[in-house]
A protein has these predicted regions:
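N-terminal phosphate/diphosphate-binding loop that engages ATP/GTP or pyrophosphate donors
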Residues: 1-51
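Cytosolic-facing regulatory segments adjacent to core modules
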Residues: 30-46, 54-93
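Generic structural signal for well-ordered, non-membrane alpha-helical segments
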Residues: 39, 69, 191-198
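A short acidic, helix-capping loop that chelates divalent metal ions and anchors anionic groups
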Residues: 64, 178-181
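Conserved catalytic-core segment of NTP-binding enzymes
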Residues: 71-170, 178-179
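C-terminal boundary of histidine-terminating zinc-finger modules
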Residues: 181-194
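C-terminal alpha-helix
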Residues: 197-208
Length: 209
């Protein structure tokens, strides 16, 4: 619901909290700060709970150069590692096209990575880049999910061209998805075709993992 969504604030933008936990002001590059700040209380304090699902917005860190270390990055990486180590939770992480939050120390706790692609060569090219980055840190359990698939030709294209990563399902293009967004209601509840397709992906994923 929109009222719950408005309660969320990205952790990466909580300057006072980051300074309190790391000992340095956000935006600081270099200098001294804590690389493993306390984060155990953050999931419950700064998330919202709806229908048994807890949502936490981590945010992103704008860095001037690759390999740059800053308090915000240390905070997010420590928080992500903490979430992976929680034994009683199922963690779903919606990430940008990359594996920047993952590392060799945490990869064993990742059951699978789903790479969502559209039926275009550019999208599949991005998927191959993600696969290489994931393999570089030891993550081998990658699977493709086709998104916004409009017809059999697009489904066939993905089946033929997705040779490097197993394809485990498709999410159909359905105008009711946009309708659900306009109405402010969950796609899962409003769009039966997407719900059925999602159940199929989950079933296949459970069989593979």
């Amino acid at each position: 619901p929109e009222e719950l969504r408005e309660e969320l604030k990205p952790i990466a933008e909580m300057d006072a909290l980051i300074e309190e936990r790391t000992g340095a002001k956000p935006g600081t590059v270099g200098g001294f700060f804590t690389l493993n700040p306390r984060v155990d209380d953050i999931p419950e304090r700064f998330s919202v709970l709806h229908r048994g699902v807890r949502l936490l917005e981590m945010g992103s860190v704008e860095l001037g150069g690759s390999g740059c270390i800053c308090p915000e990055a240390a905070m997010l990486k420590t928080l992500f590692t903490h979430l992976l180590f929680r034994k009683d939770d199922i963690l779903l992480l919606d990430m940008y096209a990359g594996v920047e939050h993952l590392g060799r120390a945490t990869v064993d706790f990742v059951d699978a990575m789903l790479v969502v692609v559209e039926a275009t060569r550019r999208s599949l090219g991005t998927a191959k880049q993600i696969k290489k980055l994931a393999n570089d840190i030891g993550l081998q359990r990658l699977y493709l999910v086709g998104n916004k698939v409009r017809n059999e030709d697009e489904a066939k294209f993905l089946e033929v061209e997705s040779k490097d990563i197993p394809l485990i399902g498709f999410l159909p293009a359905d105008l009711k998805v946009q309708e659900a967004d306009r109405l402010g209601i969950p796609v899962y509840d409003h769009v039966e075709s997407v719900k059925v397709a999602t159940h199929h992906v989950i079933r296949v994923l459970n069989e593979l993992t």
